[in-house]
Amino acid sequence: LVVALSLAIAGMAAPATPAAAAFDAGSRLPAHLCTPYFEAYTTDSPRQLSHESGARYLTLAFLQTPAPGSCTITWNGDPATPVAWSTYGADIARIRAAGGDVIPSFGGYSADHDGTEIADSCASVPAIAAAYEHVITTYNVTRLDLDTEDNSLTNNAGIDRRNRAIAMVEEWAAHVHRLVQFVYTVPTNVAGLDPTGVHVLQNAVLHHARIDIVNIMTFDYYDNLPHEMANDTRTAAGHLLGTLHDLYPNRSSVALWHMIGITEMIGIDDFGPPEIFTLADAHHVQEWARDKGIAELSFWALERDNGGCPGVAGSDSCSGLTQSAWQFTGIFSPFTHN
């Protein structure tokens, strides 16, 4: 019944185009993946930036509803950019032809703040599941990123709906023999997740929603303390490992490290100094991440990977550092391996 209901609502999903169907829907991403965020709210081409930067895998941010109360997903909440092969489809096909792939990301700070994150916006669990399935089948993707922060961390009804929808999608995927993975991207402190972040994961366990990766955003701490960003990343990840041990006591430490993702904000983050992630930090984190065997290494955002605004904090288009174009991408990209 769950599968049938979910598939019925998912009828809005158009059949895959020949270009989409050429990609094996069961193909697994590399076990250890560098996948920087691409700002889909810009006019940039994912394919072009992937080619220029050398970033073969991109996380496309963000998908949200046009208004609170809606159950319709669009890119950036804009009806002019629907979930359809006509939006990003050709780019995705070219990225795949070059040996890469994409991960669509739902939510993000703006959507989580204004109630347009799909599970906060939509009151129907089957409709939320159908939205996830629509993205999966339209773009033939095997992983979805759920960026859950701000008000989405305290909206208990939305948390419950989201995790119930994840479980529905996983049941559907098993029924139709599709590989589907879910990533929760959540903020962290140096001392680990806030209780709200832990609650999101506890609720997932309650509803038997399999979360494949917990991706922590190791930036924007806003605590007015001095920070050594690479060291703080390692510390926060160690605390996350402890949380995962509590949630999944039968899993080994190796398996739990492979549930962890890290997202840095390269250069000067939104808070500004002293939260500056340097090129040296990137080298240290990439080496540490390979050593620990984490699943994902990402950064916000590909469009920021240039030295166009030295000293500027929190820009969407440059890192605030003196650097060469795509320098962080070059440091992080070797992390991708099986």
Predicted regions and their residues:
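Beta-sheet entry/capping signal
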Residues: 101, 296-298
